[in-house]
Amino acid sequence: MNLSDHILTESELAVLSKGLNFIPCFNTKDYTSALTQDLKLFHRRLLLNKYFEDEGDGNRELFVYPNREWTPNHNILDSSINKGFKQCYEHLRHHQTFSCYHNITIEERQALKSLRSNRDIVINVADKGSNVVIQNTSDYKTEIYRQLHCSHHYLRITEPIYPTTAIKLTKILSRLKRSGFITPKQCTYLTPPPDPRPRRIYTLPKIHKPPNEWFFPSKIPPGRPIVSDIDSESYHIAEYINHFLQPLASRQASHIKDSFHFLTLLKDCHYVPSHTLLITLDVDSMYTNIDNTQGLRCLRRIFDTHPDPARPDDLLLDLISVSLSGNDFLFDGVYWLQNSGTAMGKIFAPAYANLFMTVIEQDFFLTRSFIPFFYKRYLDDIFMLWNHGLPCLEEFIAAFNGFCPSIKFKQLIDPVSVDFLDVTVFKHSPLAPQTLLCTKVHFKVTNTLQLLHRHSFHPKHTFAGIVRSQIYRYYRLSSNIEDFHSTTSILFKALRRQHYSARFLLLIKERFMRDIASGTLIGSRPKPHVTAQILPLVTTFHLGSNSVVSCFIRELRQLDSPDLAGTRIVTAYRRNK
């Protein structure tokens, strides 16, 4: 979607239509050097796995820096393994390199460089769906400034406060170490770095919102604000906080993990009365609207409800308080401070918001005579089933909207069907006294089903895996086989435009249907207990090195070595840049 004043050339349009996850051909003659280094790292991983085999993953200390320099003596490994590595190194020294085919034209490659260097436009992925959105840089900044000028949420500051925040966090970490809650190594890992990276704000355009409701109708869409916390003074501390908050959030009665978890929970309401109303609620700007004073009180209640002697409640709340109050960031050369709620981008933000909403829900329900007989929430999206009539429901929602001053809801009520997450929940027989609740895949209007272009520079098995996983997802989300076939047809039409052949797609679906019929589909039956430890050889994908890696892994698997017993060696490819 081009919202900018820049007129895209044919080549620019062609390269953008491939999607932002498209990888141009990685064409270098030095891939053997990189592969040799990756093999050495994998060799070291095998040595470390052997050296620490008696300790197990359960005893591994969390929140510590790994020692990247020390390597155990090679003699602890079976000689046949070391010999295999030596032969592979020697083979790579004499390996004949070759160039890969080009998956974009010369004009498209030039267009890509031109788009990268164009400072007048910003290219982003849409907030929902897979659309590529091009905006004028000035329009993009206008939307961010519109949000920043809300004094309730943000405050302009003359200088960064993260150096002061780092000092406060370091003092709390020292108390944690003295109290025995963290080790000296963990304290080193969690301590803010001497030169932390300033946080930066960016937005993802919400083009799924009605264009007439945009800040500048049909021109500047609202943006979802995200503050990048990576390498900041509190980044590792956020990991530590999330270690305690996330398990608590997952234990709450209203919690939904994902769409599949939602379907499992919905099975408890298999049949509902015909007068049942289906409702979805959306919390408006939940992250930024949390009152942090109230949020910390909510966390204290959760901690008291779920006591854990290994959890440093008081000091943990101190860490959270300092992290929330010190959330400054840089935008366009100016520092700003978020003074309300938390920001998407902070690791513990989803768990914090979840627990805050849990307490709000619990307290509100205690004040009501009538409540939903089914109530579940995924972050800021709520699904309810209601049997007490529309007037009572409207009173319930109005009271919910006024219960917590900072939290407001947008509702959708329907007697037959509603869309929630990526599913549509509907009544099978709306006029029957008791009706079955069914589900099918929901496609948002802006979802272009841009998965991965078939010509992207990825391993071949990646494309089949993506298609099969989507077919499997559609199958699980569809109550009726007719809906499943209908949604896969929509998917296949979109994939054909991304240069997937019809034969390739049909073969994958036919194989999937055979697995369904025979009961051999993975995921359709309980998973067996797997004890094998996965050891990945991580490397950068290149056609020239792929055969070498495959051959080496195959030979390792065939070795009858006790050092490889109970392990499963796989190849993992890092993203090309």
Which residues does each PLM region occupy?
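Charged structural interfaces that engage phosphate-rich ligands
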Residues: 1-577
